[in-house]
Amino acid sequence: MRIATRPDRRLLTLIIVSALVAGCGGEDASAPIRRLASLTRISGDQLAGTAGVALAESPIVEARDEHGAPMAGVSVRFTITGGGGALSDTSVMTGADGRASTAWLLGPDAAAAQSLRAAAGTIAADFTATASAPQAGQTYVGRNGYIEYIAGDLPIIITAPHGGALEPAELPDRTGVDVTTLRDTNTEELARTIGNVFADHAGGRPHIIIVRLRRTKIDANRELVEATKGNRLAGRAWIEFHSFTEAAKRAAMDQHGTGLYIDLHGHGHPIPRLELGYLLTSGALALPDATMDAAGHEDQSAIRTLSQASPASFAEILRGPTSLGALFEAEGFPSVPSVSSPSPGVAEYFNGGYNTDRHGSRHGGPISGVQIEANFTGVRDGQASWERFAGALVTVIAEYMAAHAPSPASTRRPVPATAP
């Protein structure tokens, strides 16, 4: 007696699919698997450049298989291995030509050996470069001229991050409830005037770094993510701004052993005066001098190193007769903090931001810093005001540094450089 059986549907489906794949010429399982065999340097090796500035030729590597053919889709990791510096991109996928590249901004120390490694798995290619110090009076620019650095030879570094006007279409506008996009009107022009007036009357030039992009595109006074909202090209400009600033600081340190960093801004607060930000809050500035000197506020300030090297007390440096505020007021520019206005009280006041924290001496190092928030009328409102303020700044900084700058004779405790 025969018993009828029903075919297994799953088995039939498998047989049909296998037949279709074979009939359609599916992938040949016997085809060889391509394996990465080498990363070859194409350009960007053994070049000379300027500290803090991108090399004229970017490092480029080409990924090749065991037959010497270029390989697309290989993930290449770029890493600085010597000299500091920065990269526009650290992880890059090779294109159809098998190539990957990154912009290499050399480290700030011209004496340091500069080196870079490109790696894909265990396969690597190494690059080297030599850096020279920025030349006083020379202008260096980043990609598309978005960031500009006019090198100096004085121990003064001035940045203007919020005065730019460029609005390139390739950069999206920064948006969000936490985003500030107000422009500090005429601070770019004021910074340029300061550089020229110093050159004419002080026997040298300060280092000037300018963001030419409007603040809707980038905020260089914020950490990277907030500054660029994750845009890669805006990130490149941010990296250039801080790389130029680090190079300027290093040049000042190498030439003079010390320096003063000024982050230049503009405010629209009701009281027309300079607001000098040392990273101390209005509440801290309201404390009596004795409390200010004893409570460790010095270590939280952007002038930590300068204060510890000065014969004056911390409170005196902030608002005494030889403070920046008092010296500005002697030149006709009302300021806070100062002798006449030791604290802002309940009035609006900017006490310093990301740049002052990063580039001042709160975390150590020989370069101290201050954020200058300039009122509009009488400071930023035209060429005559720019020149008058710049002339006053020549006098103020000369007197301030003479009174407080570190010297070999100083017996006060030095501050070691530490990472922020």
Each language-model region and where it sits:
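Generic structural signal for beta-strand residues in well-ordered domains
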Residues: 21, 54, 69, 149-151, ...
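Bacterial N-terminal signal peptides that target proteins for export
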Residues: 2-13
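Intrinsically disordered, low-complexity segments enriched in proline/serine/threonine
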Residues: 9, 61, 104, 416-418
